[in-house]
Amino acid sequence: CLISGSPGTGKTTAVARILAFLIESSSEATPLRIALAAPTAKAAIRLEEAISQIKQVLCSPDWVKNLIPEESWTIHRLLGSNADGTSYRHRESNPLPCDIVVVDEASMIDLPLMAHLLEAIPRSSRLILLGDPHQLSSIEAGAVLEDIMGPGEKNRYSLAFLKRFREYTGSDSLSPSEADESVMTDAMVELTRNYRIRDESILGRFKKSVVTGDAAETLHLLESGEESLSWLDLPDLHALKNYVRTEIGKYLNGYLKHVVKHSDNNELFASFDSFRVLCALRGGLFGTIHLNRLMEDFLKEKSGIHPSRPFYPGKALMVTNNDYALQLFNGDIGLVLADDRSKEPHSVCFREAKGAFRRLSPYTLPEHETAFAMTVHKSQGSEYERVFLFLPEADNPILNRELIYTGITRARRELTVCGRKDILIRAVSRKMERYSGLTEKIRQGQPVE
C-alpha cells in the first residue's frame, strides 16, 4: 500500500499502528519479519528516530511493540549492494527474508532502484511505501511515487472495501470511488491533516499555494508581514555578505558556542540542525558554493582560524560519493571536531543509527563538500526549525513548484525566501513533468518490467 502526505501528517505514526495491528493479528507461529528502509542514510536515521518515539506512546502490548523494529536500512544496504553499487545480493532468485517491507521517503527512489527493490521482495510479502508526491522526484530517471499514485483516486475506495470497513468500524466516513478499478484501488491513502503546521497558519497556506500553483496567492502571503514567513531581495554581493554576517550569523554564532564549549554530540548536531541555508543551485551568487564560502569566512574570522585551513572545529561536511567500505553514503553529514585522542588534530563525527556516533579522519573520507548551505535536492528527508531558501539571480529551467515546495516544507517554524519575486512566481507556475509509462501500465494492470 501507499501512504502519502506532507511532513507532519502522521505517515510514520500510521505505519507504526499498521505494523502493530499486523503483528497482533498474525496467525503465524513465528513473528513477522519486518524491514524498515529509506533511500538515504539520513532518511533511514530519521525513520529510526520516529519509530522509536512513536513506540513509546503506542497503545499496544509490550510484546507487540518489541516486535516492531527500530533499525532502518538504506535500500542499497537492505538489498546487499556490492562494492560499487551496481548489483545486489537480494534479487528474485534470492529474495529478502521479509514478510513486510516499509520504505520511507519513496519520492526519492528512482525507477531502476525501485525495480531492484520490487524484484527482491517475495510475492507473498507486503510492501508499504511512505512519501510525499509533491516533493522533488529523484535526480535519476522516473517519478515513481507520483506515477504509482496517478492511476487511482486518493481517499476513495471500492464498494467491497467500504463494506468491510463498515463491518469492522461501524463507520460510513469513507467515500466511494467513481473511477475504474486498478491494481492500486484500495491501496492508497492521502493524509491531509497536518499535526505540525496547521493548515490555516501562514506556512500551511503558503505550502498550499505552492502545491496548487497559485502564484498570486504565494506572492500575497509572502508580503503579509507574518513573523514566521518573510521575503528578502538581496540586490548585490554587499547586501548578501551583510545578511550572512547578521541574520544568518546569529545561528552560526549559536552553533559555534556549542563547538567551543565541546558540547556533547547530540547537542552539537541539534544546534547545527536548528537552521539550514538551502539553495536551488550550486553555482552563482546565491548558490551553495558561494554561500558556503561566505559562512566559512564568517566562522573562521570569529574563531581566529587562518582562511587557508581546510579543516577546523565546527566545519560541516557532506559526503558526495558512496564509500561502501567506510559505510558512508551520498548525503551523509559530518561535523569536524578537535580530537586529542589521536595523532591528528581533527576528526569528523558522523551520527549513526540508535543515537550512536562515529569518528573518522578527514583524510580518509570519500569526496565531500562544505555543508552549511546545501541544495534543496540534498535536503530531502530532513527538517529544520529555521530555513533560509535562496533562489538564483535569474530564471532557470530547474526551478519548479516541486523544488520550491520541497524547500519550504523543510521549515518547521520559520521560513525566509531570498530572491526576486518574479523568479519565485515563474517557479511556482512551472510543474515538473516526467514520462516513464509506469502510470499507464498500472492503470491497465500490466506487469511492470
Show where each model-derived region lies.
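C-terminal accessory regions
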Residues: D332-E449
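ASCE P-loop NTPase helicase motor core
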Residues: C1-L221
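Residue-level recognition of short, solvent-exposed, well-ordered loop/turn junctions
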Residues: P122, P310-P313, F329, S379
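Conserved helicase motor core of P-loop NTPases
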Residues: H134-L317, D323-L326
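Residue-level signature of catalytic and energy-coupling elements of molecular machines
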Residues: T74, D104, D132, L191, ...
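Short glycine-/polar-rich loops that comprise or flank the Walker A/P-loop
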Residues: P31-L32, C98, R123-R126, M184-M188, ...
